[in-house]
Amino acid sequence: MSNQKKSILLPGSFFEKDSQYKLNYLNLKNLHTVYVFDHTVNPVDSKLAMYEIKNAVSALQDYEERNFNIGTAVLNINKRKLDSLITKYLNPFLEIDNFKLGLGIGDNKYQENLPNYSNSLEEVIGYLFENFELSKDSRSLFLGGNSNENIRLMKKYSIGINQWLGSIKQIYKTRDVYKEIKNPKGSISLCLNKDLALENKIIFNDIELIYIIRESSTEDYRSQLDHFFK
């Protein structure tokens, strides 16, 4: 039996309708972590609702029956002033047992990256190491995107890394570098949709798979979970 970690990324309007039912249904699946992302506007359709990342984390934390971890994929460090980022997001998130903290610097792919407070990613990482005990299997840290700079930081701080879609060849290349880390403080993971999953039936077990749940009806939501967690 595979010991591969399988997780999901919640769509922006997840909490608008039937959220309790949907949480109960995903709680039946053998999933590792439920991740939320950090957008102001729904990236699929601006007319759809979009959860605020802190509120989404709180809603998941308040779900008393949960059998899964909670994480961010990813928290945009440049969206808030540094003091607010630390006191309202980083500190509360890492007070949660086994929280999987993904960090990013934002881009303009789905929405204009404004405001941009140009916080230093390396400074934020340093703060986290000074104030929290991090490990791959408990409270952990990873970076969103396998750019050259993120690869450098991954190696320097022995943290995890995530790839958003892209090619299997690229994640395997990143994996080769990640495997050189002796005691990583976070996992290597791949965000993938149904198409990418169908194209690649087998992916190395040490890569966490984060399935992107698309915006859909409650019935289709169930169908997506059933497909990813057979």
Locate predicted features:
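Flexible, charged surface loops at secondary-structure boundaries
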Residues: 1-3, 26-30, 134-136, 154-156, ...
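C-terminal alpha-helical cap/extension of soluble enzyme domains
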Residues: 188-230
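Structural motif corresponding to the early beta-alpha repeats
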Residues: 55-84
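N-terminal beta1-alpha1-beta2 module of alpha/beta enzyme domains
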Residues: 1-65, 139, 213-215, 222-229
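Structural alpha-beta junctions
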Residues: 30, 63-68, 92-99, 179-186, ...
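Internal, glycine-rich beta/alpha segment that forms the wall or movable "lid"
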Residues: 17-23, 42-45, 78-186
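Hydrophobic faces of well-ordered beta-strands that scaffold small-molecule active sites
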Residues: 4-13, 32-36, 66-73, 99-103, ...
